[in-house]
């Protein structure tokens, strides 16, 4: 089983798909990595030899912020938006959708479960 950036890649999947299990590596970047490493995208993870794995590992370490580094960059960007008080930062702070979605109905994922309010007594 190949271990890259602290993630055990699934051995029966194609290497192109297996690389997407690493946070910060999507399908397009995994295709670029394999193209740069000159490895067939249809090859299974279990069929990779050690120098191919080390080549992929070195390409990812040099060119891509992955796992903790990518999460750190993302959280710093959100924190920066909140500090400069732009509309996206304010929406992050309040926990509402950022990109113009309606909030009168729906938006349950972002707002959380319904908070029931006691009805008025007559």
UniProtKB/Swiss-Prot annotation:
Keywords, in A-Z order: Chloroplast, Plastid, Ribonucleoprotein, Ribosomal protein, RNA-binding, rRNA-binding
Presence of the UniProt keyword Transferase in the record: no
InterPro entries named among the record's database cross-references: Rbsml_uS13_C (IPR027437), Ribosomal_uS13 (IPR001892), Ribosomal_uS13-like_H2TH (IPR010979), Ribosomal_uS13_bac-type (IPR019980), Ribosomal_uS13_CS (IPR018269)
Predominant cellular place of this UniProt entry's protein: plastid
Signal peptide: none
PROSITE patterns, per the entry: RIBOSOMAL_S13_1 (PS00646), RIBOSOMAL_S13_2 (PS50159)
Family as reported in the entry's similarity comment: Belongs to the universal ribosomal protein uS13 family.
Function description: Located at the top of the head of the 30S subunit, it contacts several helices of the 16S rRNA.
Quaternary assembly: Part of the 30S ribosomal subunit.
Stated name of the protein: Small ribosomal subunit protein uS13c
Native source species: Guillardia theta
């Amino acid at each position: 089983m190949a271990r890259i950036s602290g993630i055990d890649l699934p051995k029966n999947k194609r290497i192109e798909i297996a690389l997407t299990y690493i946070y910060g590596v999507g399908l397009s970047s995994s295709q670029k990595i394999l193209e740069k490493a000159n490895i067939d995208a249809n090859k299974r993870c279990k069929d990779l030899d050690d120098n191919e794995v080390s080549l992929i590992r070195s390409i990812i370490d040099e060119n891509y912020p992955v796992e903790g580094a990518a999460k750190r960059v993302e959280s710093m960007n959100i924190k920066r938006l909140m500090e400069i008080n732009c509309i996206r930062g304010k929406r992050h702070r309040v926990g509402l959708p950022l990109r113009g979605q309606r909030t009168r109905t729906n938006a349950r994922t972002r707002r959380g479960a319904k908070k029931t309010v006691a009805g008025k007594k007559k």
